Each structure stands twice: as C-alpha cells, then as structure tokens.
Regions:
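Structured catalytic-domain cores with a bias toward divalent-metal coordination
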Residues: 1-184
Length: 184
C-alpha cells in the first residue's frame, strides 16, 4: 500500500486516515473566517468525492447529514478520498441568513469560479473569497460532488436528486447520472 497523502491547505491525511480542520478564507475583525471540513483518505485507490452542505445559512439537513457522515465514515473501509464540508456559507449560518450572506448578499449556489465576481478594485467580496478557496482547495481535487440542500426556512422542497450534464464529457455525464441514481 502506498503512503499517498491527501492534502487540503495545511491538512495532510495519509492513506487510511481521517482528519478534521478548517479551510482558511480570510481575516475579519472578529477573527479568522474559516470553513470546517473533514478529509478522509481511504485505504485503496479511487476517485475523490466532495460532499458539502450549507450553501444557504438556514438549510439544516445538509450540514446535519455531513456531520453524521464525517463521524461514521471509516477510512479503512473505503477506496478513494472524501472531503466533507458541512457548512460552506458559515457567515450566513451564523446569522441564520437565507439566500446568500449578510455581508455582500451574494448567493453561492453553484456559483464557483468564475461566476462570482471579485467585486471591483478593493478587497475581494467575501463570497468571491469563499468561492475561490472552496473551489481551489476542495472542488478542483474531486471527480464527484454531492451538494446537499434542504430548502431555506420559507421553502417547501420536494425530495429529489438533481445532477448536471456538461455535454462535454460523456463518461463524466454518465458517471454523474449513475451517482445521482445511487444517491436516490
């Protein structure tokens, strides 16, 4: 068995290991802006999967599922790697803010580089900082992603699974369809 290490920012996890930590986004007056995550490196080779919740601050089912999964998933029983991010939009969660965040009012749903604009010549918008860091450190390392939503407070969401077809890579599109079907 090789000793391949999975690295996400300064978190390093050897094969068969699991480690919790934070993605550092930026500094703010109240302290560092960070996003919690768990990195799991299975014993065997395989693809990398990102599972995230909390793109909206008042969606609780996705983060709850992520927290349970990061506790229960045993790296000794899986192949490949899993990056679990229970709460992407921590600023919205801290304030129970629906649809975006309370700082720049941008919605992160599916909007990762290059869709979220930097925001002029001054410091970049916080949503841009979150999106670029999450993309660079997690999404760009993965072949697959489960983005868990549960509906904001005022929404009545029917149960279902959606997946995206790129129209560019037929194998990836078919793999995404199979993943969505297996997920339910």
């Amino acid at each position: 068995m090789s000793q391949e290490v999975m690295k996400v920012q300064d978190i390093e996890v050897p094969k068969g290991g699991k480690k919790q930590g934070y993605l550092r986004i930026s500094e703010r007056p109240a302290g560092a802006h960070q996003i919690p995550l768990t990195v799991i490196n299975g014993v065997g080779d395989g693809p990398t999967l990102v599972i995230n919740g909390g793109e909206h601050g008042s969606e609780y089912h996705g983060p709850a599922a992520c927290l349970r999964l990061q506790t229960e998933l045993n790296p000794k029983k899986i192949n490949g790697k899993v990056i679990i991010v229970p709460m992407v939009n921590t600023l919205a969660f801290e304030t129970r803010w629906m649809h975006g965040n309370p700082i720049d009012y941008r919605d992160l749903t599916g909007c990762y580089v290059p869709e979220i604009q930097r925001g002029g010549s001054g410091p970049p918008l916080i949503s841009y900082q979150v999106a670029t860091t999450f993309y660079r450190e997690a999404l760009s390392k993965a072949q697959y992603r489960l983005n868990l939503h549960g509906g904001d407070l005022e929404e009545d969401v029917m149960e279902g699974t959606m997946y995206g077809r790129t129209g560019v890579d037929e194998k990836r599109d078919n793999d995404n369809l199979a993943l969505a079907r297996n997920f339910g």
